[in-house]
Amino acid sequence: MHKVIVFIFLTLYSLKSYGNDVIDKPHVLVSIAPYKFLVEQIAEETCFVYAIVTNHYDPHTYELPPQQIKELRQGDLWFRIGEAFEKTCERNLTCQQVDLSQNVSLIQGKPCCNQHTTNYDTHTWLSPKNLKVQVETIVTTLSKKYPQHATLYQSNGEKLLLALDQLNEEILTITSKAKQRHILVSHGAFGYFCRDYNFSQHTIEKSSHVEPSPKDVARVFRDIEQYKISSVILLEYSGRRSSAMLADRFHMHTVNLDPYAENVLVNLKTIATTFSSL
């Protein structure tokens, strides 16, 4: 009995300590999980990093519940990327906001989804080149906000930049072996990756997040025939059902990818390997 009481006491104490530790740290908000990974690589334990949308939801259609808005008000700093749900955050948050699309070479024009209030492709993290710019923005912002940790941030930022350079070289090697340069995807998430590594992206789902129309189906069929595409990439949480049905209709192989996976460095290599094996 004594051992049980001691165990319960130690468990409660550790939970209390963890809670106080989180409360004592500055809260840094990021819009999606890949940036949680990046900020944590740079800031280590100096900040508590909170992803507004986890990779269990589609950020394009996400709606913040009232309880989450209350939690977000603890934020001391917010790195945003241009998603539609950020408008709700903007109206309810007073913390410093930093747009990570700044200084990035953006793909302009009609966005991938009509939920967006931007006129550019917001999937900027799916490119090592873009990530290098964003890492520099994160390091500069954190160093100014929390100057007592600036040396740590700058050191970790340099390591991350080197890792991104190495990743870019690895992806170039992997993708150089690709035989198919035309990629069919359920949702247009890979514009920056395709631009950087010489692929062409063809999408099933257009900007409306609704079932493909007969016109869309005809367009997809033309792309399949013209470019001899034999596989379709299905994305987690976006357009899976309708795209899977089309893949079955056209007797195509399906591959699953998650553009919002938290470890973006590993994910980019996974994307490269997947594209090159189609």
Swiss-Prot record:
Quick one: signal sequence residues? 1-19
State its location(s).
Periplasm
| Domain of life of the native organism | Bacteria
Q: Keyword Transport, does the record have it?
A: yes
Pfam families per the record? ZnuA
Q: What is its main location?
A: periplasm
Keyword annotations from UniProtKB, A to Z: Metal-binding, Periplasm, Signal, Transport
User: What's a BP term from Gene Ontology annotated to this protein?
Assistant: metal ion transport
Gene Ontology molecular function? metal ion binding
Q: Listed GO cellular component terms? A: periplasmic space
Chain sites annotated for binding a divalent metal cation: 60, 123, 187, 258
Function (record text): Part of an ATP-binding cassette (ABC) transport system involved in metal import. Binds a metal with high affinity and specificity and delivers it to the membrane permease for translocation into the cytoplasm.
Q: Which family does it belong to?
A: Belongs to the bacterial solute-binding protein 9 family.
Protein name per its UniProtKB record:
Putative metal-binding protein CP_0211
Q: Which organism is it from?
A: Chlamydia pneumoniae (Chlamydophila pneumoniae)
Q: Taxonomy-wise, where does this protein's organism fall, top ranks first?
A: Bacteria, Pseudomonadati, Chlamydiota, Chlamydiia, Chlamydiales
